[in-house]
C-alpha cells in the first residue's frame, strides 16, 4: 500500500493532517472519488453517514442517530482518526470536551469525525496541505475573520 501512495498525491496531501494515516487517507480518496461531486462539506458528511437522521411530522422535528449511509469502513476510520487528532491537538481536544459536556462522549466523537471529514474535503478541494492555523470553509478564508458587534462590545 505504501508504494501506491507515491502514485496518489491526494493521499499524501490528506496524510499531512494529524491523526490521518495511510489507510484513512486512501479510503477517503477512494470513497469520495472527486471533491467536485459535492458542493459543500455538509454534503460530504451526509454522503459518509455522519449526520443525524431526521424524523419530522408537522411542526415536530426530531434528530435521531446517525444515518449510517455510505461506507461503514470509512466512517469507522474517520472516528478513529478524529480520536488520534483529539489526543495530539489542544484545539481539537478542547472542542471535543466542550461537546462532551453538552452531550454524550460518543456523540462528541462522531461530531469530531464529521469535522475531520469536512476538513479533509476542504483540504482536498483547495489543494492545500494541513496547516495548524488553517480554518477552512466554503469561502476559502478564515472562518473567524468577521467581527460581531453586540451591545457595544466587540467579539
Region locations from a protein language model:
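A detector of single, family-specific signature residues
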Residues: 1-155
